[in-house]
């Protein structure tokens, strides 16, 4: 029983924090392009991995997590994009855990629930596995990925427009994404406007859309932090190297950490591996760039 106590405590704290947060719809009405989506957002751990996941998001939102009272606010904000293959959100280690960690550092965090592919049953992971061999799923995923990227841009615009409401410096607003969420965070650097341009990007074992792969790095591309593991099951460490090469070739600021072990989806999971320390490296990077000011 004592081995379960840390997990139970984490879940209780998470539930308490979630009950206190402000949830903001990203669009005043139905999100553009998904006006006819009728399915309801669901959060459940009843899946093949017994892992808490959110799926069937048709109404994208931002949830605000203000800095902990134990730490002076830094005036910086980070939008957090969990991964999940555009089928679900891996909400614990790449969502709730990440925003809680940022709060503890005096950073205002915004959890982005972006639009996802329609899950026809009750297990998003099972459908994701089945969709790997379903050709129509590739087309659907590409369409939804573009919608999710639009949600990321909309989230950045919201935070910058309302920066004063949250005590945020409008020049220190960034975005971090994990896996599919990294597709979103990286893409926001492209075709950005003054309202939705991120001031920094976290790209953690992320991917790229074909359009992002082909596009030149913008002349004003923000500082980029990259983390991945060499034993990533989806070989996204190779994507990390490609993104890093594109950034430095364009003479833009980038820092990359490729860990020998860690696998895909390490997030905030502690494995007694060097990849556990990526969070420290990320904060150091932000400090060196003059973005994180204690």
Question: Where do the language-model regions lie?
Answer:
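Short amphipathic alpha-helix adjacent to the substrate-entry channel of hydrolases
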Residues: 91-110
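N-terminal cap/lid segment of alpha/beta-hydrolase-fold proteins
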Residues: 20-71
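Short beta-strand element of the alpha/beta-hydrolase
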Residues: 74-83
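The feature captures the conserved acid-bearing segment of alpha/beta-hydrolase catalytic domains
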Residues: 199-258
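Alpha/beta-hydrolase active-site loop
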Residues: 124-164, 278-281
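Primarily recognizes the serine-hydrolase "nucleophile elbow" in alpha/beta-hydrolase
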Residues: 144-220
């Amino acid at each position: 029983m004592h081995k379960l106590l840390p997990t139970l405590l984490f879940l209780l704290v998470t539930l308490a924090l979630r009950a206190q947060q402000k949830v903001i719809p990203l669009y005043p009405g139905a999100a553009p392009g998904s006006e006819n989506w009728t399915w309801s957002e669901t959060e459940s751990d009843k899946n093949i991995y017994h892992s808490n996941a959110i799926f069937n998001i048709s109404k994208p939102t931002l949830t605000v997590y203000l800095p902990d009272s134990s730490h002076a606010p830094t005036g910086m904000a980070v939008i957090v994009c969990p991964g999940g293959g555009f089928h679900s959100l891996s909400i614990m280690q790449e969502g709730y855990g990440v925003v809680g960690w940022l709060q503890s550092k005096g950073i205002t965090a915004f959890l982005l629930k972006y639009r996802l592919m329609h899950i026809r049953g009750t297990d998003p992971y099972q459908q994701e596995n089945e969709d790997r061999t379903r050709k129509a799923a590739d087309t659907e995923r590409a369409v939804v990925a573009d919608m999710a990227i639009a949600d990321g841009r909309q989230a950045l615009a919201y935070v910058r427009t309302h920066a004063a409401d949250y005590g945020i410096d409008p020049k220190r607003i960034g975005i971090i994404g994990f896996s599919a969420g990294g597709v979103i965070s990286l893409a926001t650097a492209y075709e950005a406007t003054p309202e939705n341009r991120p001031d920094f990007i976290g790209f953690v074992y992320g991917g790229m859309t074909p359009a992002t792969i082909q596009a030149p790095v913008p002349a004003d591309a923000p500082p980029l932090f990259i983390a991945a593991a060499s034993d990533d099951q989806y070989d996204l460490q190779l994507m990390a190297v490609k993104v890093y090469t594109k950034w430095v070739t364009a003479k833009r600021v980038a820092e990359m950490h490729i860990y020998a072990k860690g696998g895909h989806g390490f997030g905030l999971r502690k494995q007694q591996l060097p990849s556990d320390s990526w969070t420290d490296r990320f904060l150091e990077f932000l400090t060196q760039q003059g973005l994180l000011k204690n």
